[in-house]
Amino acid sequence: MSASVELSSYRDQHFKGSRSEQERSLRGSCTLYVGNLSFYTTEEQIHELFSRCGDVRVIVMGLDKYKKTPCGFCFVEYYVRAEAEAAMRFVNGTRLDDRLIRVDWDAGFIEGRQYGRGKTGGQVRDEYRTDYDAGRGGYGKLLSQKIAPNTDNR
């Protein structure tokens, strides 16, 4: 494996199995995790970009677990490992919807993983963000709840 397709240090804490089983799955996987997407990026845009590296088997958009709206990540699965490696090499760090996207190996999509794991339904990283990011819903979710006016007592 060349340097650009090596495994990162990230490991899914919810993986069902040992650390060595997870690493074995990652080394043979044809599935990629794609992060730092705009909430407005479409499946079609992702397909257009990733299909430049090979035949995409499936794209699974990450969704807010309560609202069922896009929340800034997806999984892209190829039919063959070499094409996934090409995407790791050439797509990781490129711009999509004016955002630098991150691509990492994934052990393989399992139903339920398409939902954000944060308390408010989206990704954990978007809950604690203190900066304004229009492509990811504005301010962080927890900060937005603190500064939003309470409309229950009117």
From Swiss-Prot:
GO CC entries: nuclear cap binding complex; nucleus; presynaptic cytosol
The family this protein is said to belong to: Belongs to the RRM NCBP2 family.
Self-association state and partner proteins as the record states: Component of the nuclear cap-binding complex (CBC), a heterodimer composed of Cbp80 and Cbp20 that interacts with m7GpppG-capped RNA. Interacts with Ars2.
Any one Pfam family match given in the protein's UniProt record, by short name: RRM_1
GO molecular function, one term: RNA cap binding
PROSITE patterns: RRM
Function field: Component of the cap-binding complex (CBC), which binds co-transcriptionally to the 5' cap of pre-mRNAs and is involved in various processes such as pre-mRNA splicing and RNA-mediated gene silencing (RNAi). The CBC complex is involved in miRNA-mediated RNA interference via its interaction with Ars2 and is required for primary microRNAs (miRNAs) processing. Also involved in innate immunity via the short interfering RNAs (siRNAs) processing machinery by restricting the viral RNA production.
Residue intervals of the RRM domain: 30-108
Name of the protein: Nuclear cap-binding protein subunit 2
